[in-house]
A protein has these predicted regions:
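Conserved acidic segment of CheY-like receiver
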Residues: 5-16, 21-25, 53
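Receiver (REC) domain active-site loop signature in two-component systems and cognate sites
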Residues: 59
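Short hydrophobic/Thr-rich beta-strand motif most characteristic of the beta2 strand and flanking loop
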Residues: 29-36, 44
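Conserved Asp/Asn-Gly motif in the active-site loop of CheY-like receiver
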Residues: 35-39, 94
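Short, glycine/charged-rich "phosphate-handling" switch motifs in NTP-dependent
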Residues: 103
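C-terminal output helix
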Residues: 110-120
Length: 131
């Protein structure tokens, strides 16, 4: 996707975290969609079909691991890459997240450069959806 604008869904139950991530993503030139828990994130992804989802892990109603697994198993959303964004930094959490279908895992707090690098890596490795 390179420097092209992407539609990115940010899913986080913390208003301050959501705003902080939103500011970085907007500064990188992308369009923002938001949801405040895992269940709302799944619904937003199905309705809006974003180019990518930045998903917090610890949330009410459906945690980020569960929401990621739901998106990965749904025919309409399985092509959407999910990056887990969390304070959970154990290797076991990272491995579990990747097994649920996440394409990358970034721990909070992170810099604009770190997020930009992860977004670029995920977008450059993404295959175009097949019809």
């Amino acid at each position: 996707m390179g420097n092209n604008m992407a539609r990115i869904l940010i899913v986080d139950d913390s208003p301050s975290q959501l705003l902080g991530i939103q500011r970085i993503v907007e500064k990188l030139g992308h369009e923002i969609l938001t949801a405040t828990d895992g269940a709302a994130g799944v619904e937003a992804a199905k309705a809006q079909l974003p180019d990518l989802v930045l998903m917090d892990v610890v949330m009410p109603n459906l945690n980020g691991f569960q929401a990621t697994r739901t998106l990965a198993r749904d025919a309409s959303t399985k092509h959407i890459p999910v990056i887990l964004v969390t304070t959970k930094d154990q290797d076991t959490d990272r491995m579990w997240g990747m097994r649920q279908g996440a394409k990358a895992y970034i721990t909070k707090p992170f810099s604009e450069d770190e997020l930009s690098e992860v977004l670029e890596r995920v977008f450059s490795s993404q295959e175009p959806p097949t019809a």
